[in-house]
Amino acid sequence: LISDGTLVASNVEALGSGDVTDNATLEMNTGGDFANNIGGTGSVVKSGDKTLTLSGANSYTGGTTISGGTLVANNVEALGTGDVTNNATLELNTGGTFDNAISGSGQVVKSGDETLTLSGNNTYRGATTISGGTLIATHVNALGTGAIDNRASLLLDASGQFTVTDLTTESGGNTEIGAGSTLQATTLTQKSDSTLTINLDSNTADPVIHAASQVSLAGTLDITGVGDVLDSDPASTDDLDTFTLIASDKTIAGDFEKLTVAGMDADLADFITVDGRIDDTGKQYELTTALTWYADRDDAVTDAHGTFNLTNADGSFAVNTVLENVDATLDPASATGWDGTSLIKQGAGTLILNAENTYTGGTTISGGTLVATNVEALGSGDVTDDATLELNTGGTFDNAISGSGQVVKSGDKMLTLSGANSYSGGTLISDGTLVASNVESLGTGDVTNNATLELNTGGTFDNAIGGSGNVVKSGADTLTLSGSNSYTGGTTISGGTLVASNVEALGTGDVTNNAVLELNTGGDFDNAISGSGQVEKSGDGTLTLSGSNTYTGGTTINDGTLIATSVEALGTGDVTDNATLALNTGGDFINNIGGTGRVEKSGDETLTLSGSNTYTGGTLISGGTLVATNVEALGTGDVTDNAVLELNTGGDFINNIGGTGRVEKSGDDTLTLSGTNSYTGGTTISGGTLVATNVDALGTGDVTNNATLELNTGGDFDNAISGSGQVVKSGDETLTLSGSNTYTGGTLISGGTLVATNVEALGTGDVTDNATLALNTGG
């Protein structure tokens, strides 16, 4: 019993083997193992330079002072319940929770293989050494303010900032920062084969560790709770997080040799990896999410691969960083087998590539949508598209595209596809202009064009084209559209020749033709045609133009039959007819017609030809009335008149006229028929003068003469003549009238001889004979 003053024990046996009740001061100036239990209200002082071990279950309350040597506590009760003033060395060789407050200038050593928790608000200034077991600090001041030398295991596990001078983790040691804890140190040293473990949660602030003077890194970094500080569902590479683990005021020396990461959301896309690295300033060690594409190069925790698997059909991810070849940095032991140069898009979601990428190994789209926002986005390799490739860009895209998938052109720019493509899933143009520079550019599938499709190429384009958009033919080549097309936005021909091999080839919209439109087909083409270009009809089919057309470049008929159902059908330019032009319409057709072909007038309407025509293939009138307003109107060929030919003109009409139809002379001009004509339908003279220069000029039918018929010929004219008009015999030849004529307008003989072989031959009117009248008849 110590009731007053100080009792000094100079050896561990000095107090015998019984319990000690210390109500004053017990000074232990000795070394060894003191196993006596100490109770009471007094204090214990360790003096001298020896090492003393207290192993009793002590309950004294007056505190402990270590003024010299080493005091070893081999259980957490060994120092009673009072504060500890440590000005030498306190060694805690025990497990459990030690909550006595420790102050003083001395050092604390944790020894043994047990786990010890320091929970006190400690102020000691000496170093802390962990030589064995695990030391857990559950108060931010538990380790005092001195340097820490960790040779075993240290856990800082309190919400808030631990402040120490130096923290060194020796080889084989592990320093762990608990979730919510941070550390402020003068220096941080992680030696080779050491481990730094950082546990993160949503309350963890960065940086987790700040060192004001120096950071030296080696060994292993283990990180948990990553998902609490990094976004596991980023929308783009711009959203990939950076969280600072270690910050230094000076350049960090060394680096961790190994990194392990745990606690990331299981839904984190496998194309994103978590990586730890020293930043470009060299002063921060950061935890980042990055593309797995670069994992091996950056020593990330996963093996690098080039697969982007977006499983959510409504989800998307935008890559704004450049994807380049990384084959030289790949781990040869990687299980992925990736070549480091190719990209694979999987899953139902959308991957957006925004950078000008340089990878060379090709792109495979096996699911969802891959969006390229520039023409370099898919690198330089071929594209295998088995889902959807969306090109939201302008420029020239020359990568070859194959596969069963679709290509979509979006955005308002002009994009040219120049590759020899074989994809079969079709093409959708939703905006802007898509230019095909060869007929294979759009693969083999149908095209849905809701904007502008420009075909700057020659050859045969047999893809079916639908949609509400416009098709443009540009360039100097000849392009054939052979598909059964339904697009409604119209067609523009700005260069070369566009050949339509069926009447649906140009869809249902208007055609603006500023070059050459060739229609190599039969059927009814009712699209309206405008522009300065030429229309050509080729092929042996019969084609009908039924639109109200305004094109000015002329029409060429090379083969077959071209039917015009209106006088506007052939625009306003000249017609070169080298086959058959059928005019099944009425009205005034003023276009000039040339060529070696034939003109046919069909239908029951009245059509006027007023052009100065030179066609040589003849004219067929199968229905209605064909009016010629000049003697060149029917070209130079024969006329087969099976309906009505009206000649409303003057001059010399030398074309031969045959057929079963009628010829009408109208107008007040003088017209001469000089052909050897065989038409049988009769002749009507309603105005002016009709001159016949041979007895066959008026065919074989009756003549209804209500104006003037001039017969300037010789021979036997046996056509019956009726009407109110006059008959004039001119010329010096002898003409015989042998018909039974009833005309009433009289007869004028101005030259030659007129022979009447019957008393009706000269009709009923007066005869003015200024030459010779021979009456070779009786009656």
Report residues per predicted region.
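Residue-level signature of catalytic and energy-coupling elements of molecular machines
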Residues: 151
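Extracellular repeat-rich scaffold modules on cell surfaces
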Residues: 1-14, 20-22, 26-78, 86-148, ...
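Extracellular, surface-exposed passenger/stalk and repeat segments of large secreted bacterial proteins
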Residues: 16, 80, 144, 158, ...
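Extracellular/surface-exposed low-complexity segments
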Residues: 201, 218-341
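Extracellular beta-strand/loop-rich repeat segments of large surface/secreted proteins
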Residues: 44, 108, 154-241, 471, ...
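Extracellular interaction modules
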Residues: 19-23, 83-86, 277-286, 381-385, ...
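Extended hydrophobic-aromatic, low-complexity segments
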Residues: 127, 207-209, 255
